[in-house]
């Protein structure tokens, strides 16, 4: 049972109480202080000090200072008044127990409120940090969008500048052609003047040299007229025999029918033009050429301006949808932009147009299979991707890069099967 401490001293003012409590040699670390508005307890085994205060105090602003084997309490009163005693008198044990329990409950409620306030503050801090992160990410996204927009505007300006340059070059060529025509016309006029002058000189000379007489004058006059008029050109015909195109295929592996069909399809594709497009009226002649648009798209692809390249290929396909290389090149752009389903569609369309399979279109078919297989693999459809890579290897078995990629896909498929 702890020993009650009674040798304490206290002083007061109207606003505060100063309590001095000796520790009796007990270590400060073993001292436990519990203070509420009506109750003060100091436990420093084997001693115990307990005070049921005369009036309520402000326990939050009250202080305790330990030094020189003594605890000095500064207890601030809630109401300014002088106390008759430090502890209330005439309190029985039941009343003391109620005061203790009430003080403990108040302390627990206060601790709970402090914990909840701390948790709420932590949530607010997390919410603020999340909002800051979202704001930073939004700024980064906007920055990236602005960079893309600036690149698009830059590419558009470059394209417009290139068009303007082409237009001026065409105008310059036209002016040069007109100047050459004017020079040729001047030369022709001068030649005609010289011919007229020579013919007049001959007429005068013949009149002076010829004997006088009607018959002789008529003979020479008719002769001069015949000399001055050139004879009509003779008509002839030129026969042209075109050399037939021969494919470099061995006779035992000859695919003459398929090769002829492929040539026929290529010729039809070059002739197939769709001119019923509203935008054509705003374009120059070279911009209406699918081949020119294809070359322009290739240049934009080389500069990593994939969106502008797709626009060029789109217009070329609208003009001529029978050219397989347009779909093949557009599939490469979609791969770079991660438009995987569109890349698969364009590769499949290119393979449809690259029929029948001949040596002349083998390289294009191999690229179409590789690009479609790459799109399948990025969609995690590794079995379909491997099928396309194996089809590409059948076309070009010596391609080391395709062999390595196909082996990697096989390893991925085998690893997936083992996990499952």
Curated annotation (Swiss-Prot):
Pfam families to which the protein is assigned, alphabetical: CS
Keyword presence, Flavoprotein: no
InterPro entries registered for this protein in UniProt: CS_dom, CS_DYX1C1, Dynein_assembly_factor_4, HSP20-like_chaperone, TPR-like_helical_dom_sf, TPR_rpt
Record-level Gene Ontology MF annotations: nuclear estrogen receptor binding
A GO CC annotation given for this chain: nucleus
Subcellular location: Nucleus; Cytoplasm; Cell projection, Neuron projection; Dynein axonemal particle
Name of the protein in its database record: Dynein axonemal assembly factor 4
Assigned keywords, A-Z: Cell projection, Cytoplasm, Neurogenesis, Nucleus, Repeat, TPR repeat
Example GO biological process: regulation of proteasomal protein catabolic process
Occurrences of domain CS (ranges): 3-87
TPR repeat ranges, renumbered to this chain: 290-323, 324-357, 366-399
Upper classification of the organism: Eukaryota, Metazoa, Chordata, Craniata, Vertebrata
Matches recorded under PROSITE patterns: CS, TPR, TPR_REGION
SMART domains tied to this protein: TPR
Region feature Mediates interaction with ESR1 and STUB1, mapped onto this chain: 7-103
Gene: DNAAF4
């Amino acid at each position: 049972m702890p020993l009650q401490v009674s040798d304490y001293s206290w002083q007061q003012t109207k606003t505060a109480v100063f309590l001095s409590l000796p520790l009796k040699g007990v270590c400060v670390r073993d001292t436990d202080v519990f203070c509420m508005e009506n109750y003060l307890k100091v436990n420093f085994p084997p001693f115990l000090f307990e005070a049921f205060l005369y009036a309520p105090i402000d326990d939050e602003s009250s202080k305790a200072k330990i030094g020189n084997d003594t605890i000095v309490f500064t207890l601030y009163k809630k109401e300014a008044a002088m106390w008759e005693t430090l502890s209330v008198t005439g309190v029985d044990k039941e009343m003391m127990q109620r005061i203790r329990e009430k003080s403990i409950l108040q302390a627990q409620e206060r601790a709970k409120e402090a914990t909840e306030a701390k948790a709420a503050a932590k949530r607010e801090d997390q919410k603020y940090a999340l909002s800051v992160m979202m704001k930073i990410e939004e700024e980064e996204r906007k920055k990236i969008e602005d960079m893309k927009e600036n690149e698009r505007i830059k590419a558009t300006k470059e394209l417009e500048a290139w068009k303007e340059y082409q237009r001026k070059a065409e105008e310059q060529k036209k002016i040069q052609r007109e100047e050459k025509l004017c020079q040729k016309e001047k030369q022709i006029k001068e030649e005609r003047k010289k011919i007229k002058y020579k013919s007049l000189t001959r007429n005068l000379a013949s009149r002076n040299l010829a004997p006088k007489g009607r018959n002789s004058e008529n003979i020479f006059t008719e002769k001069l007229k015949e000399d001055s008029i050139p004879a009509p050109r003779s008509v002839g015909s030129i026969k042209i025999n075109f050399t037939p195109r021969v494919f470099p295929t061995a006779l035992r592996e000859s695919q003459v029918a398929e090769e002829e069909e492929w040539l026929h399809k290529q010729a039809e594709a070059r002739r197939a033009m769709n001119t019923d497009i509203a935008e054509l009226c705003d374009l120059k002649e070279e911009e209406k050429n699918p081949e020119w648009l294809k070359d322009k798209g290739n240049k934009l692809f080389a500069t990593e301006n994939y969106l502008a390249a797709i626009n060029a290929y789109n217009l070329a396909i609208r003009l001529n949808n029978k050219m397989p290389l347009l779909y093949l090149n557009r599939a490469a752009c979609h791969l770079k932009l991660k438009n995987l389903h569109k890349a698969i569609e364009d590769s499949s369309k290119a393979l449809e147009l690259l029929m029948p399979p001949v040596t002349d279109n083998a390289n294009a078919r191999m690229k179409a299979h590789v690009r479609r297989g790459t799109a399948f693999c990025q969609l995690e459809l590794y079995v379909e991707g491997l099928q396309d890579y194996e089809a590409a290897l059948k076309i070009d078995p010596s391609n080391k890069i395709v062999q390595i990629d196909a082996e990697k896909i096989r390893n991925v498929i085998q690893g997936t099967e083992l996990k499952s």
